Structures are given as C-alpha cells and as structure tokens.
Regions:
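Anionic, Ser/Thr-rich low-complexity intrinsically disordered regions
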Residues: 1-201
Length: 201
C-alpha cells in the first residue's frame, strides 16, 4: 500500500536526520531523482529540519538577529514544503491520467499529496513522542501522559494511512477524481505582500 511505502521512507529520513541531529547537516537523498521515493524522502527531510527550526526559534535566550534569520529560513522551508507537495500531486496526476471518472464521481476535501504531507508530520510527532516516553530524567507522570498521547498518534497513523489508501483506490477506480489547486502562498511574493512590495519599489 502507498501509505506504508511513504511512512517507511519518512521514518528512514527521521532516523537518518537524528544521527547528526543538526539543522545545518548536508542533505543527501538515497533515492533516484526520477522516483516517487525521492520526493517522499525529500518531503520528510524538509519537515524534519523545519521541526527543529521551530524548536530553536522558541529558545527564550535566542539572539534577535539569529531569530530573524531563522524566521526567514522557516518561510523558505514552508515554500519548499509546498512546492514538494505539488510535485507529489503531479506524480499522482500522471499516475491516474488515463482513468475516466465514473458518473457521479466525487472530489475529496484534499488532494492525495496533502494527506501525504499530514502523514509526514505525523511520523515526526510519533518519533518525538516516543522519545519522550524513553526519557530517564522525566517523572513517571510525564512518561505516562506521553505514552497515552503516543497511543493516540499511533491510532491516528492507522486511520490516516487507511484513508489515504482508500482515496487512491477510489481515484484509480474512478469513484473520485483529483482536482489540484496550486497553493497561493502570499508572504514570499513581493507582488502580494505589501511589505515586500514597498521594498521592491
């Protein structure tokens, strides 16, 4: 099933990132650039680095100049994330281009790639919650609460994986059809962001 392929690659990316556990480490994609595996690995690596950017920027003692630079990195990462999701949707559009929708076929609330995006973020939540359950410096109460949260996340993974696979099955059978809207990110576009527009003139 596609969800298992995706999740396994996300987990591989997360584990590899945490060997060095450094947002500045070089990115090396082990998968051929012409494959969906390549896109999935890249997607999760972007998410994993951004997860840790978000940790760093919440440091109460962070230097304001460093925080500003980091905020710009987060903005760039968000754009990269969105672009990668759209590449993944392009893969699905190509996969199902010859499918004729059935009469009465319906549209989903989100495209397959945005469900993949949520699965990638969920993998990160599961990894870090699992780390919390293994802390030796935490109270028993903290460990117990995190174990409960981990069980909820694992159930969410099961449900989301099933929903994603069912969506892809429905698209392949013509019961649903894909309709993709390019995300209109406004904050990085000087034509749409009034502050950037002011500086551009």
């Amino acid at each position: 099933m596609f969800s298992k392929l995706a999740y396994d690659i996300f987990w591989e990316s997360i584990l590899r990132y945490h060997i060095a556990d450094d947002v500045n480490q070089p990115f090396e994609n082990p998968y051929d650039s012409k494959t969906i595996e390549h896109l999935l690995y890249r997607k999760n690596w972007i998410d994993t680095v951004q997860w840790h950017y978000e940790d760093i920027i919440r440091d109460p003692d962070i230097d304001p100049k460093e925080a500003l630079l980091l905020k710009r990195k987060i903005d760039a990462s968000n754009q990269d994330r969105t672009d990668t999701v759209e590449y993944i949707d392009s893969y699905f559009l190509h996969q199902y281009k010859d499918v004729t929708p059935q009469a009465g076929a319906t549209i989903n609330t989100e495209s397959p790639a945005w469900a993949v995006d949520r699965l990638s973020i969920l993998a990160l939540k599961i990894y870090h919650m699992q780390q919390e359950t293994e802390r030796t410096d935490a109270t028993a109460e903290h460990i117990a609460k995190c174990q409960e949260k981990l069980q909820v996340l694992l159930q969410q993974r099961e449900d989301l994986s099933l929903a994603l696979d069912q969506l892809l099955d429905d698209i392949a059978a013509g019961r649903k059809y894909m309709k993709v809207y390019k995300q209109m990110k406004m904050y990085n576009d000087e034509e749409l962001n009034p502050i950037l527009r002011k500086w551009g003139n």
